[in-house]
Amino acid sequence: MNKPSLPLKKRGLGRGLEALLGSKGGSSVPPTVAQEQLPGEVLRTLQTTQLQPSKYQPRREMSEAKLAELADSIKAQGVIQPIIVRELDVDMFEIVAGERRWRASQLAGLTEVPVIVRELDDRTVVAMALIENIQREDLNPLEEAQALQRLIDEFSLTHAEAAEAVGRSRAAVSNLLRLLELPLGIRTLLESHQLEMGHARALLTLTPELAAKLAKEAADQGWSVREVEHRAQQFAAGKVPDIRDKKSKSLASAPAQPDIASLETELSERLGTKVAINHGRTGKGKLVIHYTDLDVLDGVLERLRARAVG
């Protein structure tokens, strides 16, 4: 089967699906779950027991902490975005998009959830699941790379075609896919968020043995991306940097780190979602508030508004 041609300069889930599946008879591609239902579609309410996860779901694990955050938001706000499903059998439906909302709704004690039922073939369901997950904000770089590779394998895409489908640059897609070349130990550090994309990119310039050694030290010592880049350059040039030199010690023993961790925990508890504080050596930094979907974001905004009024 020939690969469908990809349209230029299109972004977003629906357009990415057009790129993968092509348009059939001018029909529109199913929209992302953030969009309103299509004309003629009816918002339905189903029992949570009538739904089951999709066999095409690429996410292997779901954070219990984040599910609990979403459950708290659903208790307060309800399920804002309907779950997209397709009918499997009489009174049984497969989740196409929204498995986290379904699981969190059950944690919140709900027995019913809002859904939109669509007629979708397997190929469309695979594409929707993969693209939606790739475009999520909370995926770590390795999960993104694995989902991209599966997308490429499922639809026999080039890197450029995959980039077009998910709204990324070709270079970004190629860089992510290179992470799959890293040794297992480094990939584990990426999955556990002990290393970031920038760290991994620097390590790709080294042999697997040197990369594994430097990755462990970087995770243990809390090195910045710039520090790892510097040391990788030294290794590549044939120099063997002292991993215990003064610069490393100053980075590893920064007194602010325990305080930063404590502040992150306090803010996360107050806002009901993950909060990260990136504190630089100059005293400057940034505060990052994570949210996994609009339900969590609404909960954060409600808490902030309540404190502002109070």
UniProtKB/Swiss-Prot annotation:
GO terms for biological process: chromosome segregation; positive regulation of sporulation resulting in formation of a cellular spore. SUPFAM superfamilies: ParB/Sulfiredoxin. One of its GO terms (molecular function) is DNA binding. Keywords: Chromosome partition, DNA-binding. Pfam families: HTH_ParB (PF17762), ParB_dimer (PF23552), ParBc (PF02195). One of its GO terms (cellular component) is chromosome. The keyword Coiled coil does not apply. The keyword Transmembrane helix does not apply. Involved in chromosome partition. Localize to both poles of the predivisional cell following completion of DNA replication. Binds to the DNA origin of replication. Belongs to the ParB family. This is Probable chromosome-partitioning protein ParB. The gene is parB.
